[in-house]
């Protein structure tokens, strides 16, 4: 299957650079995955499409202020470090710019010595393994010294970093936000609960691989990045009960989808409490075992994410919906509008 099958024309001005003042005021395209029929709504009206007994699955990961600016201890040369993944303890997989002169043994310092690091290893894709040292708690030091790493297609500085967090973000560890969840407010979640819809949480820490372009011609040859996930006993029990009682499981975001499909795929369609790493790659031909519907944003051409939504709703339905979205001037990507596939 050729990657070019997932291409579409997107005018640059439709890439949302800032979030709307009101999270739930985003537009919502509702796509019937069986017929391809489209309806246009406001996100707040998503509640009309949820039934008592359904279950929304949200990713409660929290984005780290993962970009650090520091200098090499020996020369004073400036460096930019992006935290990608915690390996164990204080060892992290990172991207360092400029990276060529940061070799094993190189020492780095940040915030006038409040945070220090030594390079332990060089990785295949150009990454570096750094081991950090500091006083106190790492995430408190990071909160003081780090910056929020916005996606590469967002050029404007964000006035309020909390707008790149969901209102329910709890478990710190992501390099990017699970953006489908950015549209929900506390009031909307309360109203959904009052309707009799279950709301449960999983955690998947989003890596920057989510923005990595597919660099092969054939979809099947793409090397998918791995991300850490976990599901609690309470969430697993609720999901199994919803499934047994005929309710729909609706994932909020591709990250929730990847978690649910990873677990259901391992356990014959059932959910169990577990944690681990997933590199599941979902594209057309995949048979879904965990979800019935999906809330998601509008994705980049030729990305693994547009392949995932095409697996759920059909490639032709998705590409037609995206053509309509461009014509109707929907806002695209992380700060853009949303789609509900049911």
UniProtKB/Swiss-Prot annotation:
Keywords: Cytoplasm, Queuosine biosynthesis, S-adenosyl-L-methionine, Transferase. The keyword S-adenosyl-L-methionine applies. The keyword Isomerase does not apply. It catalyses: 7-aminomethyl-7-carbaguanosine(34) in tRNA + S-adenosyl-L-methionine = epoxyqueuosine(34) in tRNA + adenine + L-methionine + 2 H(+). Its EC number is 2.4.99.17. It is an enzyme of class 2 (transferase). Pathway: tRNA modification; tRNA-queuosine biosynthesis. SUPFAM superfamilies: QueA-like (SSF111337). It is found in: Cytoplasm. One of its GO terms (biological process) is tRNA wobble guanine modification. It comes from the Bacteria. Signal peptide: none annotated. It holds the Pfam family Queuosine_synth. GO terms for cellular component: cytoplasm. One of its GO terms (molecular function) is S-adenosylmethionine:tRNA ribosyltransferase-isomerase activity. Monomer. Belongs to the QueA family. Transfers and isomerizes the ribose moiety from AdoMet to the 7-aminomethyl group of 7-deazaguanine (preQ1-tRNA) to give epoxyqueuosine (oQ-tRNA). NCBIfam families: PRK00147.1, queA. This is S-adenosylmethionine:tRNA ribosyltransferase-isomerase.
């Amino acid at each position: 299957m050729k990657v070019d099958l997932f291409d579409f024309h997107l005018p640059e001005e439709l890439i949302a650079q800032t979030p709307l003042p009101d999270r739930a005021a985003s537009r919502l395209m509702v796509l019937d995955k069986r017929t391809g029929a489209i309806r246009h709504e406001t996100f707040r009206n998503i509640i009309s499409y949820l039934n008592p007994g359904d279950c929304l699955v949200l990713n409660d990961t929290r984005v780290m202020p993962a970009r650090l600016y520091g200098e090499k201890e020996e020369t004073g040369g400036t460096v930019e470090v992006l935290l990608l993944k915690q390996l164990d303890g204080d060892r992290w997989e990172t991207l360092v710019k400029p990276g060529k002169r940061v070799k094993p043994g190189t020492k780095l310092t940040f915030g006038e010595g409040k945070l220090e690091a030594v390079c332990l290893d060089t990785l295949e894709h150009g990454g570096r393994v750094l081991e950090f040292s500091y006083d106190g708690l790492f995430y408190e030091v990071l909160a003081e010294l780090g910056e929020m790493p916005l996606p590469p297609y967002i050029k404007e500085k964000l006035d309020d970093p909390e707008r790149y967090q969901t209102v329910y973000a709890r478990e710190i560890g992501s390099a990017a936000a699970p953006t489908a969840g950015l549209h929900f407010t506390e009031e909307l979640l309360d109203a959904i609960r009052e309707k009799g819809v279950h709301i449960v949480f999983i955690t998947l820490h989003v890596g920057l691989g989510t923005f990595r372009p597919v660099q092969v011609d054939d979809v099947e040859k793409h090397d998918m990045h791995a991300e850490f996930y976990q599901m609690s006993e309470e969430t697993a029990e609720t999901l199994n009960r919803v499934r047994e009682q005929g309710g729909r499981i609706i994932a909020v975001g591709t990250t929730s989808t990847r978690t649910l499909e990873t677990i259901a795929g391992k356990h014959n369609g059932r959910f169990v409490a577990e944690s681990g790493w997933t590199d599941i790659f979902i594209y057309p031909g995949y048979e879904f075992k965990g979800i019935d519907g999906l809330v998601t944003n509008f994705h980049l051409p030729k990305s693994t994410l547009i392949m995932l939504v095409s697996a759920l709703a059909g490639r032709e339905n998705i590409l037609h919906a995206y053509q309509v979205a461009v014509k109707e001037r929907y806002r695209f990507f992380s700060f853009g509008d949303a789609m509900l596939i049911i």
